[in-house]
């Protein structure tokens, strides 16, 4: 509906002026901020004499009496106006109510397929706060693409192969505990890895032994190693699945580097573009971009070798518009090399995209001083419990409800904390700070949603479903009209996110929307007012809740009904 509204505005302005629809669209900027005009036409972008044309256009539009626009004015060489919100009020609210949980969706990707690879932790390392970014950003992109009509395949490509497994297997033979492995495979394997890495720093022979173990794995020559590796992998994946469920993250495919070991070798052995370096290793020479090592002189493959094989298989299996990799900016060079090699092999480079992000401050893995994400979720949940207790909500929840609600609030706060800044920027993790200052946080958005749901529940006897019988003049109030206009913008914000996969766009919009809801809620009181006024007001509040709900879902949060 958003696009249709502005298409009509463009056509109406064009019809009344000397400018084509294409010219009007090219010079038009739109806004929902109350202190800015809804529409500004920057005529200096399309006219050699913008000031003269601005005066002429203002006079023309003033005489045209276009129903959809009002408050015409000139600002320097631009013509400004507002959308006549009274004219669209009924249609916007009716459209939101009709579409409800799919309001904000679009058909940009209809008939097209996308593949998104994200999370992709290493089996040998713990799942810490640094992994949160790829996981939740990747799920956001999947949610966004599906809301935009794309058939989307989500892939978790585990780091389940490589030299580090030589270290893990060697470490387990020395420091492993069957009891600890069963109890918490991720934490135990990480502790084993840290201990054997410390040994390697003191004794070079440990490093050589680990390399030899991995070489035997590559050649499938050691049954003990392979059986133990498979067990580590299975136990770890089951543990990850539990964590993913808590984060509202789901994958269509659980994959891993190990699945592409042989195919990677085959590409190296059969590719005509491959070159042998002076030391006997195999490389792709990308010219100015440098050489890309894909096989060492001892015959072992590398991470990028398996990435090449995985990318080719995905192209063949899914025929996607694009394969998106959600990985930190630390891996920029890796993906430049990967896409360069794929292009050299004859594949379209534009089929691949690296969506990067900045890092969470204070994370280190060398000394083992890293918090498990599982522990962080639990600590964050305790913080949220304290917030709920301080709001005197203890009596309205059972113990189980308190735990469940606090965890949803914790996850929501983690998500919004991660998504508030642009993804290319890093941030410092501080859940207690976010709990103390709730403005703009996940807690703030959930509170706004719960408040609206509570009003709906308390006024369940008020029937606003028959839009045709509602008296919309009862809510011709500036704050309400601006709020409803802002609700329509959700469609545009979702579509705009497809340009850069930037979740901060939706977070900023939802924060602003929640603020507008809080600013208008006192003049939208439902309880104890005239029946017709109650119907009109509740329709607005219900529509606002639907938009908040849908926005939270795209971000990956579970909207709460009470807190």
From Swiss-Prot:
It comes from the Eukaryota. Pfam families: DALR_1, tRNA-synt_1d. It is an enzyme of class 6 (ligase). GO terms for cellular component: mitochondrion. Gene3D superfamilies: HUPs, Isoleucyl-tRNA Synthetase, Domain 1. Coiled coil: none annotated. The keyword Phosphoprotein does not apply. One of its GO terms (biological process) is arginyl-tRNA aminoacylation. Its EC number is 6.1.1.19. Keywords: Aminoacyl-tRNA synthetase, ATP-binding, Ligase, Nucleotide-binding, Protein biosynthesis. GO terms for molecular function: arginine-tRNA ligase activity; ATP binding. Transmembrane segments: none annotated. Belongs to the class-I aminoacyl-tRNA synthetase family. Monomer. This is Arginine--tRNA ligase.
């Amino acid at each position: 509906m958003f696009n249709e509204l502005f298409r009509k505005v463009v056509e109406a302005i064009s019809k009344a002026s000397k400018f084509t629809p294409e010219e009007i669209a090219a010079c038009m900027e739109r806004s929902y901020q109350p202190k800015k005009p809804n529409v500004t036409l920057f005529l200096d972008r399309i006219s050699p004499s913008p000031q003269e044309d601005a005066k002429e256009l203002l006079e023309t539009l003033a005489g045209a009496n276009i129903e959809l626009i009002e408050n015409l004015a000139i600002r320097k060489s631009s013509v400004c106006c507002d959308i006549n919100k009274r004219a669209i009020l009924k249609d916007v609210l009716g459209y939101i109510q009709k579409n409800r949980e799919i309001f904000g969706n679009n058909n940009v990707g209809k008939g097209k397929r996308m593949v998104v690879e994200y999370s992709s932790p290493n089996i040998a390392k713990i799942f810490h706060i640094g992994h949160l970014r790829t996981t939740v950003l990747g799920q956001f992109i999947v949610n966004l693409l599906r809301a935009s009509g794309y058939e989307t395949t989500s892939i978790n490509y585990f780091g389940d192969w490589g030299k580090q497994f030589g270290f893990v297997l060697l470490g387990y033979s020395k420091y492993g505990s069957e009891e600890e492995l069963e109890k918490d495979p991720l934490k135990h394997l990480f502790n084993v890895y840290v201990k054997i890495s410390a040994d390697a720093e003191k004794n070079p022979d440990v490093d050589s032994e680990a390399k030899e173990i991995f070489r035997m794995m590559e050649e499938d020559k050691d049954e003990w190693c392979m059986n133990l590796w498979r067990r580590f992998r299975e136990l770890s994946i089951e543990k990850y699945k539990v964590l993913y469920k808590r984060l509202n993250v789901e994958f269509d495919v659980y994959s891993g580097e190990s699945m592409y070991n042989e195919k990677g070798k085959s590409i190296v052995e059969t590719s005509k573009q491959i070159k042998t370096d002076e030391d006997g290793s195999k490389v792709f020479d990308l010219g100015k971009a440098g050489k890309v090592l894909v096989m060492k002189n001892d015959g072992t493959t590398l991470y990028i070798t398996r990435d090449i094989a995985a990318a080719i298989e995905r192209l063949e299996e899914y025929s996607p518009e694009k394969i998106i990799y959600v990985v930190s900016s630390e891996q920029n060079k890796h993906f430049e090399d990967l896409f360069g090699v794929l292009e050299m092999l004859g594949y379209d480079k534009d089929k691949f995209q690296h969506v990067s992000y900045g890092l969470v401050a204070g994370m280190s893995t060398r000394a083992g001083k890293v918090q498990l994400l599982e522990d962080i979720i639990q600590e964050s949940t305790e913080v949220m419990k304290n917030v709920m207790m301080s709001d005197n909500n203890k009596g309205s929840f059972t113990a189980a409800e308190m735990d469940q609600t606090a965890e949803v609030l914790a996850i929501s706060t983690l998500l919004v904390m991660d998504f508030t800044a642009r993804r290319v920027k890093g941030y410092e993790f501080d859940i207690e700070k976010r709990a103390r200052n709730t403005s703009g946080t996940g807690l703030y958005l959930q509170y706004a949603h719960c408040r609206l749901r509570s009003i709906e529940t308390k006024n369940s006897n008020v029937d606003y479903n028959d839009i045709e019988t509602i008296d919309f003049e009862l809510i011709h109030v500036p704050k309400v009209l601006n709020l409803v206009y802002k609700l329509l913008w959700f469609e545009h914000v979702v579509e705009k996110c497809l340009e850069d996969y930037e979740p901060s766009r939706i977070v900023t919009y939802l924060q602003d929307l929640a603020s507008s809801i809080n600013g208008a809620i006192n003049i939208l009181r439902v309880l104890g007012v005239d029946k017709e006024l109650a119907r009109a007001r509740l329709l607005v509040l219900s529509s606002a809740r639907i938009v908040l709900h849908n926005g939270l879902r795209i971000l990956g949060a579970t909207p709460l009904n009470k807190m």
